[in-house]
Amino acid sequence: MIINKLNLIKNEIQLKINVSKFHPKIIAVSKTHEMNIILPLIKYGHEDFGENKAQEALLKWKQIKLDYPNVKLHMIGKIQTNKVKYVVDLFDYIHSLDSINLAEKISIEQKKKNKSLKIFIQVNIGNEIQKSGISLGQLNEFYNLCTQDLKLNIIGLMCLPPKDDNTKEYFIQMKNLAQKINVKELSMGMSNDYLDATKHGATYLRIGSKIFGNRN
């Protein structure tokens, strides 16, 4: 059932959008779901999974990642600075770098563990007070700090656009921002807007309910 849902999404992207040159990676957002629900996807060969709480993910994924070394774990939630050590231990990607303080903590922890995670800067694309993320005006300076001073491996940008009728415009804006700072990856698009996101350059889609169903 879950495998069928994943394949339906892939087929829909293939049929409705010209993605002959690239295929966006689908991150199956497995947060709050038990491993018995997730395991069929892993055994099927799906590799990318998203979690939003470091310690919960550690309990759930530590052994699985040893058993299935091809699995890539994506931190998609807000990271508390006192949880950075767990994130660096377990995860392969961070999609939610949103402050200088967090960037510094990640840099320190990576040096301790001799690791280099692939990182997205979270952009507050709608300039919303209630959301985290780097403002458009600060993005260039923040990117330079992360890459030059802290030596972080910034591969792209991530956004959570406002829930309004301008979602496509935000996706277009994100693509333009990525081109300006010369990063290739865009983490944008979820269960309700992944087709629009793909049309406008998303390379990573974060899809939860469309694969796993609604959470309890």
Outline where the language-model segments fall.
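Expand to "…catalyze enediolate/carbanion chemistry for C-C bond making/breaking, isomerization
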Residues: 198, 211-216
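Conserved alpha/beta-domain cores
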Residues: 1-185, 190-192, 198-200
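Divalent-metal-activated hydrolytic enzyme cores
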Residues: 203-204
